[in-house]
């Protein structure tokens, strides 16, 4: 990995094992093909009924879903839940520039692809396994735009997405290049515009 993700994963597992009794299995890819590729591999290997995806910097607590369950926000009619930093009940701590960049990207995604989801880029997402397997098997993008492709794939299958509040804290360990990555993502968004789903 060219970024610090492997070291972050190793550190997280060590800390997690110290404080919890949950078993963790690390799946290592031979090559760094991007976040989308890593998630696709993880979903393929997952065994339980629900699959949670999240960013390794833990901007959102791994156990945020417990708060959702406590508030009875998980319903049978929904199979996919997206953490949303724009939700009115979310608590978000991030720098001003990242906030502005996020707003611009959200506007572009909505304008170009007619997507109504307000926060496609929050990495904290919960899927029913059968849905995750179906959608991730069709995923082609491995970069930051993979989140947008997931929404389009879900939309094509008429699978509803429910956006839920999160407590989100910006971590400086993020591998996002604030100059180059948004450009690549915009190109990816326009390419998705002309793809059939």
Predicted feature locations:
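A conserved acidic beta->alpha catalytic loop
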Residues: 1-7, 58
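Active-site phosphate/pyrophosphate- and oxyanion-stabilizing loops and adjacent acidic/basic residues
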Residues: 7-10, 40, 152
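Conserved hydrophobic residues forming the short capping helix/wall of the S-adenosyl-L-methionine
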Residues: 9-17, 72
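Acceptor/aglycone-binding surface of glycosyltransferases and processive sugar-polymer synthases
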Residues: 22-24, 29-45, 50-53, 62-144, ...
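Catalytic donor-sugar/metal-binding loop of nucleotide-sugar-dependent glycosyltransferases
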Residues: 115-116, 142, 151-169
């Amino acid at each position: 990995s060219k970024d610090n993700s492997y070291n972050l994963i190793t550190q997280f597992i060590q800390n997690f094992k110290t404080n919890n009794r949950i078993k963790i299995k690390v799946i290592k890819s031979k090559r760094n093909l991007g976040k989308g590729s890593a998630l696709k591999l993880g979903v393929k290997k997952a065994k339980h009924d629900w699959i949670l995806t999240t960013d390794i910097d833990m901007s959102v607590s791994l156990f945020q879903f417990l708060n959702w369950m406590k508030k009875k926000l998980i319903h049978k009619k929904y199979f996919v839940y997206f953490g949303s930093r724009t939700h009115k009940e979310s608590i978000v701590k991030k720098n001003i520039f990242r906030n502005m960049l996020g707003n611009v990207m959200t506007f572009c995604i909505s304008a170009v692809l007619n997507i109504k989801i307000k926060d496609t880029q929050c990495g904290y997402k919960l899927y029913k396994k059968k849905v995750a397997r179906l959608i991730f098997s069709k995923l082609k993008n491995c970069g930051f735009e993979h989140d947008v492709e997931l929404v389009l794939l879900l939309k094509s299958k008429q699978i509803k997405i429910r956006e839920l509040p999160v407590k989100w804290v910006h971590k400086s360990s993020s591998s996002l290049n604030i100059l180059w990555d948004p450009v690549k993502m915009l190109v990816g968004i326009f390419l998705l515009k002309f793809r059939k789903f």
